[in-house]
Amino acid sequence: NYARGKVLGGCSSINAMIYMRGQARDYDQWAELTGDPDWSWAASLEDFKAHEDHYRLDNSANSLDPKIQERARLHGSGGEWRVEKQRLRWEILEAYAKAATQTGIPETDDFNGGDNTGAGYFDVNQRSGWRWNTSKAFLRPVKKRPNLEIWTHAHVTKLNLSMDADGQKRCTSVEIRVKGKDHTVEAGLEVLLSAGAIGSPHILQLSGIGCPEHLASVGVEVEHDLKGVGRNLQDHLQIRTVYGVEGVKTLNKMASTLMGKAAFAIEYALKRTGPMSMAPSQLGIFTKSDPALKHANLEFHVQPLSLEAFGQPLHDFPAITASVCNLNPTSRGTVLLKSADPF
């Protein structure tokens, strides 16, 4: 089961708030495969900077400090997307980072320069201790535009195709259910489908766009043969390891009493700091599984807490969690229909 951000802001409203660009080689590979230089790291970096409001550049306009100039080469200021330093540090995480450097992994204070190899704290998408999602950043400032309507509680059920004058199929309308009532929205120019790696293939296949054999097997009439729909799903396996610790603060211990929980709430209410302001994963480590590799292919998320599964209570003993995931999985999955029912 995939967690789905069915809310304004999408997954940025429910995720771990970590601000993380890909490696430069990822974007350069896309540019090479597509033949489009706009996908390159150099071009993408300018787009990142244009929309960033990065804490490293706060109050540093026109600075001649070489360090600040280097930050300005990699980051932007005044954009919609706020990036901040985490507002909490943990002794146990500092020790973990030090252990990483002792194995030869370099220390870093910025994972977003194109080569994320290193150990350090993640930057987060927050503003003054509050989650900063794409709805707050991009949608809220323009929601009063006369040419924009925002529908909530709306579920897209089908894209309707028509043949245009030159014999090309085009999406000309969208069927939507809003609070139990069906609507058809006509497209004046174009339809943009942006429902994510799970939602987009789901909607396309419900609309008869996909592999004919699969669509026929669930009773969907084929509108357009496009066998790649729902194929090539990529995701990274994450393995969580829990380590019991002694003599240091952990969230498990601090949250084990009513007084501890109350202290969290009071600190957050008064100062927007403390455990209630923290990202679930605070410390990151990017490294190689084999020294012969050119780039980091493993990522560690290190947390000052432990639990059986996300959404379940913290363990009743002091512990930390170090999760590791593969950045470049070679396995591929599918997103296919179980039935023709959009719900």
Placement of each model-derived feature along the sequence:
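N-terminal glycine-rich phosphate/pyrophosphate-binding loop and immediately adjacent elements
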Residues: N1-H51, Y55-S60, K169, E221-G228, ...
